């Protein structure tokens, strides 16, 4: 059954909301526990500054579960892109209609904004001043080019998995949510301490918007999380398309 664009738009809003509320939300709680929620300080270096592997594993699993939940609950409605880089990559290989790219991306950004703003409303100002709303930024000492490359590599792996388990009609059914979610969790655990491991322009946009309302400005890093994920996702989609052709 073909869903209307309005229904798919709504599903992308809801799906991205779930991703950003629970994924970056887990990063916020981790930072608040580590730093003390009663000691707010201006958050200005992003979650890339988190240290322990245990912290990153916990955050990665929160993302994994949120993504799996979205894919299994909303995937049949909109495809559960919940990521502008995925939408653009699928369009670039002819697997998604061009006329729907902008509506999907708008929906994803709306969902991300709602996720961060409602998390801020639930937790209070410390979610931003201590936890930065889970915003991503390069770890101190990581250059702009290094950060873009890291995000591109991480999103390349994610998109390659998406192509193999969700887009390719030959993929065994029922595993997409689990495999994609665990892939994101693994990538976050691996590169989180370099860039915060966004892999998704919308996932970064939401926290940046919420932080801006609290006087925290990280927008100088936003191009990293647009260029890197889009380049990585498009490259993976084209490579898989080439390799999978019989």
Curated annotation (Swiss-Prot):
Sequence motif: NPA 2, positions: 200-202
GO MF assignments: channel activity
Stretches in topological domain Cytoplasmic: 1-12, 78-104, 168-173, 239-246
Gene3D superfamilies given in the database record: Glycerol uptake facilitator protein
Protein topology in the membrane: Multi-pass membrane protein
Pfam families: MIP
A GO-annotated cellular component: plasma membrane
Topology, Extracellular side: 34-56, 126-146, 195-217
Entries under PANTHER family matching the protein: AQUAPORIN NIP1-1-RELATED (PTHR45724:SF13), AQUAPORIN NIP2-1 (PTHR45724)
Family in the record: Belongs to the MIP/aquaporin (TC 1.A.8) family.
The name this protein goes by in its record: Probable aquaporin AqpM
Species assigned in the record: Archaeoglobus fulgidus (strain ATCC 49558 / DSM 4304 / JCM 9628 / NBRC 100126 / VC-16)
Lineage, uppermost ranks: Archaea, Methanobacteriati, Methanobacteriota, Archaeoglobi, Archaeoglobales
